[in-house]
């Protein structure tokens, strides 16, 4: 819960009383509710389109950096020279990953372009993964949810930023099995900065949450390693739970972990029962932590309280 402070909270300044200080946010707050919601959905769709770029390119960029470091250390030529010299989240233009056809502007329109193209590349007719419209739609829904919960305020923007990062990290974890430090660590620091004003938790609770989140899964990791001889959880998951603790405070961590554990176990059992995976096969835990964090952000801690927490 946000705590009272003598310093005005810039993340909660969407009300008319703060209109003079809110700048563009005040103009947005003055719009009819329907227009606010429509704008939030469009913003979410656009951000979702960019998240697809992050999900596709960031693992490639990291792999390229690793190969370059190996080549530098060993003196061998870089093993991957198939990409352009400049390859990042901004350049080159988006292209079909199969044929390399550069996408036109209208082919980048979120969701609608997927429908217009009937889910296939216009050039090579290779099917486009359903992940692209799903991430865009999820991002739009999360933006609308943040606006509905927090109103036209900086808190809504911060909440949507958290959800967008969780969405991208979940997709990357499902695709590659790892959570990039370039996303988890900035998310942790962002949570501490946002809670300087007690936006989602007091700063004290946020700092304790970051420490407790990391140490809790660290203990689980080493306990599993002592009992089974293997690491049952990745270090990226430790950093993600620390980031969620920094955003939501230590009080929210039991519910986040509970939701993640129950959802992960349920999905794992169903996937094993249907033959989609072997019992001993690892299941990425990041998406379930992200789901627990998002559920706690939007709904508070009623599930934990119902269980007697």
Curated annotation (Swiss-Prot):
Pfam families: A24_N_bact, Peptidase_A24. It is a multi-pass membrane protein. The chain crosses the membrane at residues 35-55, 147-167, 183-203, 207-227, 230-250, 253-273, 288-308. One of its GO terms (cellular component) is plasma membrane. It comes from the Bacteria. Zn(2+) binds at residues 96, 99, 121, 124. It is found in: Cell inner membrane. Keywords: Cell inner membrane, Cell membrane, Hydrolase, Membrane, Metal-binding, Methyltransferase, Multifunctional enzyme, Protease, S-adenosyl-L-methionine, Transferase, Transmembrane, Transmembrane helix, Zinc. InterPro entries: Peptidase_A24A_bac, Prepilin_IV_endopep_pep, Prepilin_pept_A24_N, Prepilin_peptidase/N-MTase. One of its GO terms (molecular function) is metal ion binding. Its EC number is 3.4.23.43, 2.1.1.-. Zinc is required for the N-terminal methylation of the mature pilin, but not for signal peptide cleavage. One of its GO terms (biological process) is methylation. It catalyses: Typically cleaves a -Gly-|-Phe- bond to release an N-terminal, basic peptide of 5-8 residues from type IV prepilin, and then N-methylates the new N-terminal amino group, the methyl donor being S-adenosyl-L-methionine. Its cofactor is Zn(2+). Belongs to the peptidase A24 family. Plays an essential role in type IV pili and type II pseudopili formation by proteolytically removing the leader sequence from substrate proteins and subsequently monomethylating the alpha-amino group of the newly exposed N-terminal phenylalanine. This is Prepilin leader peptidase/N-methyltransferase. The lineage of its organism: Bacteria, Pseudomonadati, Pseudomonadota, Betaproteobacteria, Burkholderiales.
């Amino acid at each position: 819960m946000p705590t009272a402070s003598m310093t005005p909270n810039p993340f909660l300044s969407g009300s008319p009383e703060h209109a003079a200080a809110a700048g563009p946010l005040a103009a947005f707050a003055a719009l009819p509710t329907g227009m606010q919601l429509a704008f939030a959905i469009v913003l979410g769709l656009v951000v979702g389109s960019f998240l697809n770029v992050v999900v596709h390119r960031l693992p490639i960029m990291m792999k390229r950096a690793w190969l370059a470091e190996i080549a530098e250390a060993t003196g061998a030529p870089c093993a991957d020279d198939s990409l352009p010299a400049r390859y990042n989240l901004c350049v080159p233009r988006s292209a079909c990953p199969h044929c390399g056809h550069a996408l036109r502007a209208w082919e980048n329109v979120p969701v609608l372009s997927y429908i217009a193209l009937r889910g296939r590349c216009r050039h090579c007719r290779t099917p486009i993964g359903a992940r692209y419209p799903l991430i865009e739609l999820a991002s739009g829904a999360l933006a609308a949810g943040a606006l509905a919960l927090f109103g036209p305020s900086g808190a809504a923007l911060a909440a949507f930023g958290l959800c967008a990062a969780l969405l991208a990290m979940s997709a990357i974890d499902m695709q590659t099995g790892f959570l990039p430090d370039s996303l988890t660590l900035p998310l942790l620091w962002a949570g501490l900065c946002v809670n300087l004003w007690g936006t989602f938790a007091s700063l004290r609770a946020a700092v304790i949450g970051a420490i407790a989140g990391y140490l809790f899964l660290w203990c689980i990791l080493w306990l599993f390693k002592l009992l089974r001889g293997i690491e049952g959880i990745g270090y990226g998951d430790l950093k993600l739970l620390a980031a969620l603790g920094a955003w939501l405070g230590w009080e929210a961590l039991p519910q986040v972990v509970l939701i993640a554990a129950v959802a992960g176990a349920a999905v794992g059992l169903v996937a094993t029962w249907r033959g989609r995976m072997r019992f001993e096969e690892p299941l990425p835990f990041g998406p379930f932590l992200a789901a627990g964090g998002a559920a706690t952000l939007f709904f508070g801690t009623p599930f934990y309280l119902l269980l007697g927490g």
